Amino acid sequence: MGLEVLEALDSARTQWYHVTAIVIAGMGFFTDAYDLFCISTVSKLLGRLYYFDPSTNKPGKLPPSVNNVVTGVALVGTLSGQLVFGWLGDKLGRKKVYGVTLIIMVACAICSGLSFGSSAKSVMITLCFFRFWLGFGIGGDYPLSATIMSEYANKRTRGAFIAAVFAMQGVGIIFAGLVSMVFSGIFKAYYQAPRFNEDPILSTQPEGDLLWRLILMIGAVPAAMTYYWRMKMPETGRYTAIVEGNAKQAAADMARVLDIEIIAEQDKLAEFKAANDYPLWSSEFFNRHGRHLIGTMSCWFLLDIAFYSQNLTQKDIYPAMGLIRQDKEMNAIDEVFQTSRAMFVVALFGTFPGYWFTVFFIEKLGRFKIQLVGFFMMSFFMFVIGVKYEYLKDENKNLFALLYGLTFFFANFGPNSTTFVLPAELFPTRVRSTCHAFSAASGKAGAMVGAFGIQYYTLDGTPRKIRRAMMILAFTNLIGFFCTFLVTETKGRSLEEISGEDGRESELTATPNDRAPGIRQDSRTEKM
């Protein structure tokens, strides 16, 4: 029982409109990544500027509680935004709320840089307030961008298109390092200062207060540039037809987009909707889709514990790898420069390639294999780093950097990408955005465990604690490896076939062997 508008979307050739959709949705993730990760390049500068205590003979450092809130509050906002906008995306439509997320991101990125106050505490409170709402807007982009790209794409290249949107996160991380490096390089040239061990007071340039504000505010630029084009996108044909029940409008919108003639099938649509009218909170939904929802939520939760722990604590790992000097050997702005340069190098050679390997291979290898191998390799490399941490830190920094980079590579050519793709494919249209939001919010809950738990535990940088943290993260990834068996391969099939909306056998009733990629492909055509 297929609708012509859905079949047209599934069989459409790849054309310029698909590329445009990738860029528009992807630029949101570029902004998301920049805003979430640029804080890592300036958090030590905030400590030097606002929390220097001359009696310690050490550079100022954010207190553990303040550091956790500054770096983690955006994650709390992101989780909230995912749930709210994911639900709204199903209730009101993807397009109606898509522009709101961008407005919030632009406004709060600018306001983060304008954080004010007469004391260190008041500045941090203001900064955290705006970064919470920045995260709220960022969170809304997760389910909406994934769902929109999933519903626009054809079934042959859908995974690659969704992964390409998410891969812009890698570009955003690189850009966060690059912008911080360029701006701090300019400031370092114009506002020279002695190192901390030469003059603790003069080593912190007052101009650094302008530097961190500029770095945070730059995040508003790419989001603002795409607002017009985001508002020009029509509602997805699947939402218009299946949820709103307007076959005529769906056919007209998609005919204009795909440049083909599509017949509106209103009578057939009524039959289609009647067969798929069970609510989200029902036993029928959980019988059909509960295992997949548990799988996507648990895998994303476990992945983000490790992924965000690494990203948010890498500024503390870099000195151990020899990528930057010890803090006493630098002035405040030089520390920003060296931290951002190290972040840029690791992202360019470790983080960025993994995203695009997923884009190029996801339709060949499938989501299941990529996620399985990614979790396993992350667990292996983190285990090696944990066991040999002192040796790597003291005697083989090059190997340390290689292993650390490989964990990022296999995170992104692995579960960091596939946990974003799978929830956009596994669930019915009328709850797709909400289910993606549940999965993404579960991931952000894991990120908060990393930000508030692992980061707090390793904040003092003692080798024993970092070693233990790496071992914990290795075990976490191993659990993610086994949780992957709760999801199924979606490669090469329509969204309606995967979710059972077309009346065929739901994947949730398939045997465990059917879940493995490349096995019993003939089961796709079996009837209930």
From Swiss-Prot:
It is a multi-pass membrane protein. Residues 40-68, 118-122, 180-208, 314-341, 393-401, 455-468 are extracellular. It is found in: Cell membrane. Mostly expressed in mycorrhizal roots. Also observed in root tips of non-mycorrhizal roots, in a phosphate (Pi) depended-manner, highest expression levels being observed in low Pi conditions. CDD domains: MFS_PhT. Optimum pH is 3-4. One of its GO terms (biological process) is transmembrane transport. PANTHER family: SOLUTE CARRIER FAMILY 22 MEMBER. This is Low affinity inorganic phosphate transporter 4.
